[in-house]
Curated annotation (Swiss-Prot):
Record keywords, A-Z: Cytoplasm, Lipopolysaccharide biosynthesis, Nucleotidyltransferase, Transferase
Protein name: 8-amino-3,8-dideoxy-manno-octulosonate cytidylyltransferase
One cellular component term from this protein's GO annotations in UniProt: cytosol
Naturally occurring in which organism (per UniProt): Shewanella amazonensis (strain ATCC BAA-1098 / SB2B)
Record function comment: Activates KDO8N (a required 8-carbon sugar) for incorporation into bacterial lipopolysaccharide in the Shewanella genus.
Reactions mediated catalytically: 8-amino-3,8-dideoxy-alpha-D-manno-octulosonate + CTP = CMP-8-amino-3,8-dideoxy-alpha-D-manno-oct-2-ulosonate + diphosphate
Chief subcellular location: cytoplasm
This enzyme's EC code(s): 2.7.7.90
Pathway annotation from the record: Bacterial outer membrane biogenesis; lipopolysaccharide biosynthesis
One GO BP annotation of this record: lipopolysaccharide biosynthetic process
Stored InterPro entries: Cytidylyl_trans, KdsB, Nucleotide-diphossugar_trans
Keyword flag Transferase: yes
Keyword Nucleotidyltransferase: yes
Amino acid sequence: MNVTLLIPARYGSSRFPGKPLAPINGKPMIQHVYERAALAKGLNAIYVATDDERIKDAVESFGGKVVMTGADAASGTDRIEDAITQLGLADDDLVINLQGDQPLIDPISIEQIVELFRRHPGEFEMATLGYQISDKAELDDPKHVKMVFDNDMYALYFSRACIPFGRDVSEYPVYKHLGVYAYTRRFVHTFNSLPLGRLEDLEKLEQLRALEYGHRIKVAISAFDSPEVDTPEDIRRCENRLKVD
């Protein structure tokens, strides 16, 4: 099975312009993401998918590979499809979509999501990761997307609200979504051909489109958290974590 990992990265974030190039312990964030992904076993290639020459130059300066995408990509998945079309991937090739703002991603988590497809060929078209919440402050924080899944580890729903709801969740595990996806090249095209979902539009969560149109998402629970960098304040937390790692 051919496995290509793509890291979509854009410069023009409204909350944090230039985020992929933000320095973390002396390296641009995109370099941390790329280098941690490169430690994962079982990948055939890694590319940063971007439309920005500054990001391209930064990635190439540390020896990374880049595929330039169009500036009109409406979403990360649109950028992914543009990239895999340029790369000429086959329909059954596996694509890993790792967000460019996850400098703390553990390579074992990437291996875990690849292994799902190796163990269950043809059973599903899309997979993702979850992590059990230990910080109660994250339960009601819409920045941390919560998820529920069935007994066979297929996603039932994703929400910015706390799900499942309970008057006392202290002894009930609640899981958050980690922004790593795996899918076949064929399914990326299928996904992008679907109209915007109502729930997707309401929650502003792209993965809900797959569920709304009846596509199953397999879930693996990671032992490692991978917090995303959304604001400059998150950089300091990442720096402290990386020093410990």
